[in-house]
Amino acid sequence: MIMKKSYLLAGGVAALLLTACGQEDTATGAAEQKEVLEMGTSAEFAPFESRNPQGDIVGFDIDLANYIADELGVELKITDMKFDGLIGALQNDRVDLVLAGMSATDARKENVDFSTEYNHSGEMFVSQKGSGLETLEDLEGLTVGVQLGTIQEEGAKSIIEEEAIDFELKALDDSGALIQEILSGRIDAAYMDKQVALGYIEAQGLDAFDDPTTASPGMAVAFPKGSDLVDDVNAVLAEMEESGKLDELKDKWLTDEQ
């Protein structure tokens, strides 16, 4: 059973002030807040979230989530699942929030709420060294892999339709599988988040080029529709931006400057 504590709203900004369990709400207007926040992620998206050799989930999003939880005075519990199941987990109240390098697209906003954006990467097409793939036109007639349920899957479909580039699309469960498909020659390229791609490019000696089309939305924290947590998390993100803490996390985890 999850224990409950109360928090006060002060100065128009929600700040969690944990009180003794069972204490009644004050007259200043309080809302119940879980003492344990259940967070969903998909740990196949380094440097945002992945498992280290010890099996622990680490990454930019994990440090960010832990910082947010500390600021709100709550414990964080992380559940690892497939990326394409994260929205459903929010809708079914299995988790309270999701940090998974998730872009705040209009389609997703119909089903969940988002915080303010905390990072924007852009996309890249990754291929084997010496592939000669340098432009969208070079992808004509080839097979391009994407991670299932991601904005890159949506973006690749848009490129096929809007840029009139005819390539076959192959959706896989995670970014690691995409790289294995490239190395084995089963796909010609993978369309990936730029920050994720840069790590694989360095590790595997791969080639890549930037997607020149319209930039995708930035990454944000996702919540169930109507969640009271949105304002609280936005307040923490604003403080992190102001204090430079967000830049510190980017310097620690992200290869490119943001």
Q: Model-predicted segments: where are they?
A:
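C-terminal motif of bacterial Sec signal peptides marking the signal peptidase cleavage site
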Residues: 17-20
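Ligand-binding clefts/hinges and TM-proximal coupling segments of bilobed small-molecule sensing domains
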Residues: 23-27, 151-170, 206-211, 238-258
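Flexible hinge/capping segments at coil-to-helix
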Residues: 28-30, 127-144, 231
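Extracytoplasmic small-molecule ligand-binding "clamshell" domains
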Residues: 31-101, 243
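Short loop->beta-strand "edge-of-pocket" segments that line small-molecule binding or catalytic clefts
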Residues: 37-41, 137-152
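Periplasmic-binding protein-like
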Residues: 43, 120-127, 194, 198, ...
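Acidic, polar ligand-binding/catalytic clefts
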Residues: 75-138, 208-213
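A ligand-binding cleft/hinge motif common to bilobed small-molecule-binding domains
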Residues: 102-110, 155-159, 183-184, 188-215
